[in-house]
Amino acid sequence: MNERSTPQALTGPVIRAERLGKTYSEGKLLTQVFDGLDLQVMRGETVAIVGASGAGKSTLLHLLGGLDVPTAGEVYVAGQRMSALSDGDRGRLRNKTLGFIYQFHHLLPEFTALENVMMPVLLSGQSVCSGQMRAQMLLEAVELGHRLNYKPSELSGGERQRAAVARALANSPDCVLGDEPTGNLDNRTASTVFELMLELNRAQRTSLVLVTHDRGLARCLDRVLELYQGGLRELTSAEV
């Protein structure tokens, strides 16, 4: 795993899960995904979550991001208990505090790269001018300054994912949650996008929580956690 130190100077966790449980029901069949799961992600920290297919990695990410509701336990984001918030307040906190990157870029096809990256800024109530400036700066940071007015269909796969990274950072979030963000890319492009995320983490002190099946990428992060039998355990360097 990465030898750089976890940022002790930055106080408090940006995300905290306490005794988290999640159970799905289909008729009389109950499927328990988590039971009593605990997790803390400190500000500026990078964390990989690994585990077998079907272990619940994506479900955990959705719970941490307030996109799904736990059956038991609590999730705190930026110190706020998610279950105590209304749907509207939870959405506003999510838009302000968290960024999301998925295996598929989820860019809106009818809008340009610039317009896609602007959207979280506009949704937070800022002006179009502020949104344009922020989006252009981020797209230049991900080396897409020459593609501002290109629509997703006019971008390569790697360019689309870099635009998705820029969009995730549009509101300067405390934490970015990534669900296999390089999973659909070839090895070279995946490495480029991953290095970009780490550079932005270092520059902006944005926490990263990445679900990945790639142990090589996981080793580059501060901590690697394995989701196994409904709980999390931290892996040593030798185990990754």
Curated annotation (Swiss-Prot):
Known EC number: 7.6.2.-
Top EC category: translocase
GO terms classed as biological process: lipoprotein localization to outer membrane; protein localization to outer membrane
Keywords: ATP-binding, Cell inner membrane, Cell membrane, Membrane, Nucleotide-binding, Translocase, Transport
Residues that, per the record, bind ATP: G51, A52, S53, G54, A55, G56, K57, S58
Annotated ranges, domain ABC transporter: 15-240
Function summary: Part of the ABC transporter complex LolCDE involved in the translocation of mature outer membrane-directed lipoproteins, from the inner membrane to the periplasmic chaperone, LolA. Responsible for the formation of the LolA-lipoprotein complex in an ATP-dependent manner.
GO cellular component, one term: plasma membrane
Subunit structure: The complex is composed of two ATP-binding proteins (LolD) and two transmembrane proteins (LolC and LolE).
Location (main, coarse): membrane
Keyword Nucleotide-binding (UniProt): yes
Annotated GO MF terms: ATP binding; ATP hydrolysis activity; transmembrane transporter activity
Subcellular location: Cell inner membrane
Record's protein name: Lipoprotein-releasing system ATP-binding protein LolD
Domain of life: Bacteria
Membrane topology designation: Peripheral membrane protein
Family label: Belongs to the ABC transporter superfamily. Lipoprotein translocase (TC 3.A.1.125) family.
